Regions:
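N-terminal non-catalytic structural scaffold regions of very large proteins
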Residues: 2-378, 396, 564-566, 578
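PLD/PLD-like phosphodiesterase catalytic module centered on the HKD motif
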Residues: 3, 107-121, 126, 147, ...
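Hydrophobic alpha-helical scaffolding
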Residues: 12, 16, 77, 92-96, ...
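Conserved small/polar residues in nucleotide/adenosyl-binding loops
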Residues: 26, 43, 599-606
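Signature of lipid phosphatidyltransferase scaffolds
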Residues: 213-229, 240-242, 453-528
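Conserved helix-loop functional segments at active or binding sites
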Residues: 361-365, 369-376, 388, 401, ...
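Active-site core of PLP-dependent enzymes with the aminotransferase class I/II
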Residues: 390-397, 557
Length: 606
């Protein structure tokens, strides 16, 4: 299969720009007036959370490339500097649409629904003002730490993603002698962090019975900010927020202890290079100039925002009581028929493979599989991979119990699961303390497979039970994300699962596989061979179809292979959740390819 002619840069979409298109699709859900109002709030919050991570990881990585003098182009022919320039334009446009959606569509609709968001503390009634001031004195003031900047106090370190209020203050003519060096009328900079330990969305009395009124914590602080600087006049005060480079740089070959090295790098995450500054669009120019200078940030990375900073807080508004009529009813996963009224999960699996489709089917059988294995006296060993788990994970508890019950328990905990590193370090230590053998995977690779192997002693001998799945062993997100899994005791899967764990924990590399296709060594070649098979079928006039679901499609060889298949007449149907670097509809190249966005499940059919 000669793919050379299909690997030209004009046939590919830049990875980062494709991701921004994905976030735009999520934003389109927030703009869709056919959806329940509070669902739209949730989607808008998700777009903001997505954009935060995009800047902290992807934009940060591109800036690192520019700083390092890296000039090579990506598969779409763009340098890092060119990508950053285009990203700045696109993200400013996206943020503009976010706030237009909030201000022109969502807030008016919320008002009609009886939910009032006080945009400015100046709009409070007398009764609301009294409540807010009392709330400040009782709950907020004791937590605040105002910090000034002068010759003896340098600009303070501002943590990543924190919301802060910057102020320009001027010493009063008649004041105490605390700051003798400050001249009356001279402008000074001060800042105070909006405490993340306090609720950002605060409910206050409503004008009308039955309505709900909320105000943001930063508005409460702004209203009372003069109480933090008693000897000074507050000239202006405005919120701001920064985003820092949060991508971990770990040399796994040099690291003597991966867990310790990741812990060390995590401490640096809060203090990486500032890559984005968000401010109110009405911020005093003198204050803005100070922030841009101190953070050493370019104009292209400043976002002047018409509304509250950090829209992830809308998830708190979504959670307000009394508005169920404006939300999609919570879906209740259906019980898995094979496991109903059955206490012995192993007997069910022996009777036949069981396919699970989450969240439509309950995740309980997966949890119960590990729980029963932990208690079953005939179970000799449990092996499992963990990427992301819930905060109070029943899976972790069951694995710890299994080890305490004397079973051989081996767990691969992926320490490099982005933004779950700290959680996974905690779980790894807990499992080790319980007696589990904890491993961290292969150097230079993330282990993203979801696999559990239970080795059980039975009358006929040793039998291996396997659970394979997409997604995570996370009982919370399993109620939200679309994933699939299978239970089996087919010995071919058992042999393959054993080989996977031996490869992860030691130096064993299987020569062949019975049923599994494992990345990164074997999967790409297998997919390319399947693509070529369909292309040959099309050439012979035989039925030829490729239908695939995936998280992202970025690999240039796979994309070129799909172009080749399309040019041979193969119908290609792609469901791609996020990034898609493939261009559809290119004459002679991808005319037979149809690609749409979708949810989390990954599957491949040829």
């Amino acid at each position: 299969m000669d793919l050379g002619k299909f690997e030209k840069k004009e046939y590919f979409v830049n990875r980062e720009l494709s991701w921004l298109k994905f976030d735009e699709r999520v934003l389109s859900e927030a703009r869709d007036k056919n959806l329940p109002l509070f669902d739209r709030l949730k989607f808008l919050s998700i777009t903001a959370s997505n954009l935060d991570e995009f800047f902290m990881v992807r934009v940060a990585s591109l800036k690192d490339q520019v700083h390092a003098g890296y000039h090579k182009t990506d598969i779409a022919g763009m340098t890092a500097k060119e990508q950053l320039k285009e990203i700045s334009v696109r993200t400013h446009e996206l943020v503009h649409v976010q706030y237009n959606t909030l201000n022109r569509s969502l807030i008016p609709a919320l008002e009609k629904a009886g939910m009032h968001l006080v945009a400015a503390h100046e709009n409070l009634t007398e009764a609301q003002s009294a409540f807010v001031d009392r709330y400040f004195e009782d709950n907020v003031y004791p937590v605040l730490t105002p910090m000034a900047m002068d010759s003896s106090r340098p600009f303070p370190l501002i943590r990543n993603k924190t919301l802060n209020i910057g102020a320009l203050i001027s010493k009063k003519e008649k004041s105490d002698k605390l700051n003798k060096k400050d001249k009356a009328g001279e402008l000074l900079f001060a800042t105070v962090q909006v405490p993340s330990v306090l609720p950002r969305v605060v409910q206050i009395p409503s004008k009308k019975d039955g309505d709900t009124t909320v105000i943001l914590l930063e508005e409460i602080i702004e209203r009372n900010i003069d109480k933090l600087f008693l000897s000074y006049d507050v000239i202006c005060a405005h919120p701001y927020r920064i985003m820092r480079n949060a991508d971990l740089t770990i040399d796994e070959d040099e690291a003597e202890d991966l867990l310790v090295e990741i812990q060390r790098q995590l401490k640096k995450r809060q203090w990486g290079e500032v890559i984005r500054l968000e401010v109110e669009d009405k911020m005093d120019e003198r204050l803005l100039k100070i922030l841009k200078t101190e953070f050493d940030i370019k104009e292209a990375d400043v976002f002047e925002i018409n509304g509250p900073l950090d829209l992830t807080m809308l998830m708190k508004v979504y959670g307000a009581d009394g508005f169920d009529a404006y939300k999609t009813p919570r879906y209740q996963p259906a019980p898995v028929p094979e496991f109903q009224n059955e206490k012995d999960i192993f007997q069910v699996i022996r009777e036949g493979d069981v396919f699970l489709h989450h969240p439509y089917m309950s995740f309980d059988p997966v949890v119960n599989f590990v729980r029963q294995a932990a208690k079953d006296p005939d179970v000799l060993a449990i092996k499992q991979t963990l990427y992301r788990v819930s905060g109070n994970s029943p899976i972790i508890a069951a694995l710890a119990q299994a080890a305490e019950n004397g079973k051989q328990v081996s767990v691969l905990v992926e320490l490099k699961a982005r933004f779950d590193e700290e959680n996974n370090i905690v779980w790894a230590k807990k499992l080790e303390k319980a007696g589990c053998h904890v491993i961290y995977g292969l150097v230079g690779l993330k282990t993203h497979s979801k696999i559990t192997l239970v080795v059980r002693r039975e009358e006929t001998g040793i039998r291996r039970y396997v659970h394979l799945a997409t997604g995570n062993y996370n009982d919370s997100t399993a109620k939200l994300y679309t994933d699939c899994g299978i239970f089996t005791c087919d010995e071919r899967f058992g042999e393959d699962a054993t080989a996977v764990f031996n490869m992860l924990s030691g130096y064993s590399e299987p020569k062949s596989w019975n049923k599994l296709i494992v990345a990164p060594i074997w999967m790409k070649d297998r997919f390319l061979s399947l693509i070529e098979r369909e292309a040959e079928n099309a050439k012979k006039g035989l039925p030829a179809l490729i239908r695939a679901k995936m998280n992202s499609l970025c690999d240039p060889k796979i994309i070129a292979g799909l172009y080749y298949a399309s040019s041979c007449g193969v119908q290609v149907e792609l469901l791609v959740r996020g990034i898609c670097c493939l261009k559809v509809g290119v004459p002679g190249i991808s005319e037979n390819i149809h690609a749409v966005s979708y949810t989390h499940l990954r599957a491949h059919e040829t």
